[in-house]
Structures are given as C-alpha cells and as structure tokens.
Curated annotation (Swiss-Prot):
Residues that coordinate or bind Mg(2+): 40, 62
Family in the record: Belongs to the TRAFAC class TrmE-Era-EngA-EngB-Septin-like GTPase superfamily. EngB GTPase family.
Organism, scientific name: Legionella pneumophila (strain Lens)
InterPro entries linked: G_ENGB_dom, GTP-bd, GTP-bd_ribosome_bio_YsxC, P-loop_NTPase
Name used for this protein in its record: Probable GTP-binding protein EngB
NCBIfam families registered for this protein in UniProt: GTPase_YsxC (TIGR03598)
Biological classification of the source: Bacteria, Pseudomonadati, Pseudomonadota, Gammaproteobacteria, Legionellales
Physiological role: Necessary for normal cell division and for the maintenance of normal septation.
Cellular component terms per the entry's GO annotation: cytosol
GO MF annotation: an example: metal ion binding
Coiled-coil segments: none
Length: 200
C-alpha cells in the first residue's frame, strides 16, 4: 500500500460517548495515551497533515473520541488523553469509563496504538489500558514517543525494557520508538497499520 494513503484521512465526527459512534462495522484502529504523550503530533505525522488532530500546549484538551475516515470501511480513532492532573476527578472517571467501554465493546476495533513518552513508560493507566486490550485478545502496538529527547542507546534500552515487560504477551504486544519531530518510526508504524486494516 502506498504510504500516502494515510494522508487521505479526513475528519469524520466527534463523540462524547460510545453510543454516539458510527455503526460498529469495518475497521477501526485506536490511538490512546496519556495527555502529554504526543498523540496528536503522532497522528499528524502519520497523515502528513499538521492540522488533522489538534495539538495543544495544554495536556488533556482532547475530551472527545475523534474519528477520521481513511475510506468507507476504515477509520482512525483518536481517544481522549488520560492521566492529566489538572482535570477534575469526575471528568477523569468519565473518560476512563468511555475508554473501557470503547475497548471492550467495539467489535470493529482491530488494534490499539498506545503512546507512551519514552522517558516515562509503563505508567499505571498505560498498563491498565494494555490489560483491557489483552483481556479481549486485541493487539497492542506501543509507540515510545519523543525519541528525539534521548540518545540512541537510551531509546534502545527503553524499547528493550518495555518489550521485556510484556514478553509473555509478545504475540499481541509490539513496541517501537517514534519521533514526530524527526519522523522516525513512521514506516514501521504504517506497516503495523497496513496489517490491521488488511489493505489489499
């Protein structure tokens, strides 16, 4: 599949709850991560569109489930960022409930791209999200973002650490380094997405 197919992503809709999402059919791949993990930047990098997902200096800005259409059957899903301290507790709990509901109930979900800051991987909520996915045998591809902030050896060690942590689930969990700034890791991410979307 040509790399530029992801650049055809267009905004489809926003949903506050799972029951507001489009019909549960086709293929969806969800992007999730802590509020400061660089999720919007990664989506913009993948699609080569700096305006696709709104980036903000204020973590926790994405409070809705945002869907982007690749074609009639395939969608990218930007899930609300989680774990930001300045968000009210009831809002946090609502987000987490929506995340859990989406991951457990959405039958067209083919995989989860989970973003973690390479300097601070494996936070509690990250692990909870992976466990939710593994509970329903959903593949997870972990992007260790902001790899440009560390040396190559530090990045390599971080990737190894996360791989070892999930080695018992290696049939479902894969890990790579990623930098939106340098566009490092984009092709590896695309190869995972291509497989999940079953592009012919």
């Amino acid at each position: 599949m040509p790399i530029n197919l992801y650049s055809k992503a267009v905004f489809l809709k926003s949903a506050a709850r799972v029951n507001q999402l489009p019909e549960d059919s086709g293929y969806e791949v969800a992007f999730a991560g802590r509020s400061n993990a660089g999720k919007s930047s990664a989506l913009n990098c993948l699609t080569n569109n700096k305006n696709l997902a709104r980036t903000s200096k204020t973590p926790g800005r994405t409070q809705l489930i945002n869907l982007f259409s690749l074609d009639e059957q395939r969608r990218l899903v930007d899930l609300p960022g989680y774990g930001y301290a300045k968000v009210a507790m009831e809002v946090k709990l609502e987000w987490q409930k929506n995340l859990a509901h989406y991951l457990e109930a959405r039958q067209c979900l083919r995989g989860l791209i989970l973003l973690m800051d390479v300097r601070h991987p494996l936070k509690d909520l990250d692990q909870i999200l992976v466990n939710w996915a593994l509970h329903r045998e959903l593949p997870v591809h972990i992007l260790l973002t902001k790899a440009d902030k560390l040396s190559r050896s530090e990045v390599k060690n971080a990737v190894l650490k996360v791989r070892q942590y999930y080695e018992l689930a290696e049939h479902l969990v894969s890990v790579q380094a990623f930098s939106s700034v340098k566009k490092d890791g984009v092709e590896e991410l695309i190869s995972v997405l291509d497989r999940w979307y079953e592009w012919n």
